[in-house]
Structure formats: structure tokens, C-alpha cells
A protein has these predicted regions:
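Short amphipathic alpha-helix
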Residues: 9-21
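Conserved nucleotide-sugar phosphate-binding/catalytic loop shared by glycosyltransferases and other
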Residues: 1-6, 21-86
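Conserved nucleotide-sugar donor-binding subdomain of glycosyltransferases
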Residues: 76-108
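Glycosyltransferases and closely related glycan-assembly transferases
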Residues: 93-106, 115-129
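Short beta->alpha connector loops at strand-helix junctions that form conserved
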Residues: 54-58, 109, 130-133
Length: 134
């Protein structure tokens, strides 16, 4: 299970995890969050989650209201380049983590961390489900 960055991502993950544990008590449910996420202690404390891991992630800033100005904004572009490397590192970390964990399925809920985990899962041939209740 992966997602994070806000309670809006984590809360549905925990609800799905609790229901899965009711229906499949022997299922091993693992949460993969974003490295440095201040909310990672929430899934770690939940009894439905058996283990918590973290990987690098980043985002691409694309502010439509700024138009052409954003394209030439060096700070925005520098942050995008930095986060591209974070995403690539996250895919690499996720690939090896998934190889070790050998999950049958990946459940993604959104947030920046979902991208590297889902991409690594896809490259590894692991099916994934994307949940969006918004």
C-alpha cells in the first residue's frame, strides 16, 4: 500500500487495510511512504499495517497561472531537476524493495510517493490498483 503526504491519502489507505485484515486476517499489509514524510508515524501505529518502509519521491511543478514566466523561472526548474533525480532514486529503491517483499498487488492512493512505487511495480510485473475517492 502506498500514498501519502496528507491525511487525505493516508486515511483511506488505513480504512482499506482494516477491511482487508477483516476479510484476510493472514494477509501481510505493508505501507510504503515518502522518505521524510511527517505523517509516516500514522500508518506505523495502525494495527492493520504490518510494516512501514519509505522511498524517495518528488514532484514536478507546473503552475498554469504563470504561463511562460514559469518556463523561465530558474528556481522552479532547479527544483524540478532535483525532484526528477528523487523520483528516479525512488523508482530504484522501490524496485529493490518490491523485489525483496514480493507483493501480489500494489494499492496506490495518491501522493508523490505513489509514482515511483507504481512505476517499479509495473517494471516488475506486479499488478497495481489506483484508488481515488476525490
Amino acid at each position: 500500500m502506498t500514498g501519502g503526504g496528507s491525511g487525505g491519502h493516508i486515511t483511506p489507505i488505513l480504512a482499506v487495510a482494516a477491511e482487508l485484515k477483516k476479510q484476510l486476517p493472514d494477509a501481510r499489509l505493508v505501507y510504503i511512504g515518502q522518505r521524510g514524510d511527517r505523517l509516516s508515524d500514522i500508518p506505523a501505529a495502525d494495527p492493520s499495517i504490518d510494516a512501514v518502509y519509505s522511498v524517495s519521491a518528488g514532484k514536478f511543478r507546473r503552475y498554469k497561472s504563470d504561463g511562460i514566466k514559469q518556463i523561465f523561472d530558474l528556481k522552479t526548474q532547479a527544483l524540478n531537476v532535483r525532484d526528477l533525480f528523487r523520483i528516479l532514486a525512488g523508482i530504484w529503491q522501490s524496485f529493490w524493495l518490491l523485489r525483496r517483499l514480493r507483493p501480489e498487488l500494489i494499492f496506490t492512493r495518491g501522493g508523490f510517493v505513489s509514482v515511483p512505487v507504481a512505476v517499479a511495480g509495473r517494471l516488475s510485473g506486479i499488478p497495481y490498483i489506483t484508488h481515488d475517492s476525490d
